[in-house]
Amino acid sequence: MPSLKSFSAAEEEDDQLGRNSEAERFNPEAVEKEEDPDKMDEKDESGDEEDDVKRDQVEAEDEEALGEEEDSKERSQSSSAGELSESEYMVVDLADICKDVQCSICLGIIRKTRTVMECLHRFCRECIDKSMRLGNNECPTCRKHCASRRSLRDDPNFDALIAALFKNIDKFEEEELNFRQDDEARNKQIQASIAQVSQRQSKALVKRKSVGKGTAILSRSRRSGGGSRRRRNCRNIEQDTSEANDDDDQNKRGKDSSSDEPCERQRKKRSATQPSSSNANNNDNCAGNGTEQTHQRDSRVISPVLVWNSELIAWGRGGTRSNTRQGNNNQGAISKRNARLKRLVEYLGSLEGNSVELDIHLKLVSLDTEGLLNLHEPYLCFRPTLLVKQLREYVARHLKLKAEEVELLVSKDGDTVIGNKTSTEKMQSLQDDETVAKLKVDCISSNGYMIVVYRRKQIA
């Protein structure tokens, strides 16, 4: 067996040598490489250097990647911690929490909290103790029965929460009070402005209504005037056409001798209708009697010229058709009279709202105690707003005296006292700031005017 192994090893060495020789034949470069060992060493050294540089680059890249991974881990940890912190805390408005931490007895923030064990409602210690001492053995919020003050328990956790939310309770309550007062003042101002606007609107509406009534009256008067003119013109035209038709009919009837009897009958009928229309017009006292008579005489004859007038042809309005159909010749005059009365009533009603100031008539009489002459024009007419001072100046100017030297008197008994010029006991002196309207009712005489007496003022 060992001899076989050695033989196989020798054969393998020969095979390798043969292969190397064949490779040298077909690869002359390899032979040259083997022949230059210095070059081979230089190449090996340069390759080692390149490998070292590559290794350094790979290590640097690995270190950078590790650093980035660590940074990302730190960032993720910090972000997760921030999210946890944000989830733990939330922003709260104190105005929204006030209702939850408010005592229902004093309506302020709870101080030294005490909780009712039966219903878990919280109150201030002083408030609930005082309520219990007064005999209210029940919860002030839900009215649940409480046996005694033993059912009350302190709540330090709630006190700690209030202390964390409201660091200065007194200051917070003061700010809330000021805010409420400002809000109330603002609401009052808004209400006052709304009231002023409503008053202005109501005044504007009243003015519009008054102006509208005045314009309506003017427009009605103009329309009525225009309508009356149109009616007169139409009646004149109709009268002319009816007279022409009558002349033609008479000529035709004169030619036909056989139709004498019906003509006489028609004339009798027309003459019979004339006095009734004239009597009705006289009773109504209308201005256009002549034109209405002619219109009622020939009401049976309708000319084609009047077709455009809607007032004469309208049914039931006192026009020609209604007169001919119903046989009532006075209906047009009655409707006109009613229209005039209606306009007069509307005009008088519109005058009721206007404050019309009427003039006051007075007579100036002199007592002639010191030889003062009477005025040339003693009867005067003044407005009610005239002052006594102005009247005194008027008298003094005509008497050529100063206004301070003239004294005006008035008597409430009328002409009886003034007849005795020397007696001034029942007369009353007038002040400068008085108006004539104040003296109108008390001092009117039987003649319908006011009597004022003047004299020279007696200076002590």
UniProtKB/Swiss-Prot annotation:
Q: Which organism is it from?
A: Arabidopsis thaliana (Mouse-ear cress)
Query: What Gene Ontology molecular-function terms does this entry list?
Result: transferase activity; zinc ion binding
**Where along the chain is composition biased (Acidic residues)?**
32-51, 59-71, 240-249
A Pfam family cross-referenced in the UniProt record is zf-C3HC4_2
The reaction(s) this protein catalyses: S-ubiquitinyl-[E2 ubiquitin-conjugating enzyme]-L-cysteine + [acceptor protein]-L-lysine = [E2 ubiquitin-conjugating enzyme]-L-cysteine + N(6)-ubiquitinyl-[acceptor protein]-L-lysine
The record, for SUPFAM superfamilies, names:
RING/U-box
Protein name, per record? Putative E3 ubiquitin-protein ligase RING1b
Q: Which SMART domains match?
A: RING
Keyword Zinc-finger appears in the UniProt entry: yes
From the UniProt record, give one GO term of the biological process aspect: maintenance of inflorescence meristem identity
- What are the alphabetically sorted keywords of the record? Chromatin regulator, Metal-binding, Nucleus, Repressor, Transcription, Transcription regulation, Transferase, Ubl conjugation pathway, Zinc, Zinc-finger
**Gene that specifies this protein:** RING1B
Q: What happens when the gene is disrupted?
A: Normal phenotype. Drastic growth defects like ectopic meristem formation and sterility when associated with the disruption of RING1A.
Job of this protein: Putative E3 ubiquitin-protein ligase that mediates monoubiquitination of 'Lys-119' of histone H2A (H2AK119ub), thereby playing a central role in histone code and gene regulation.
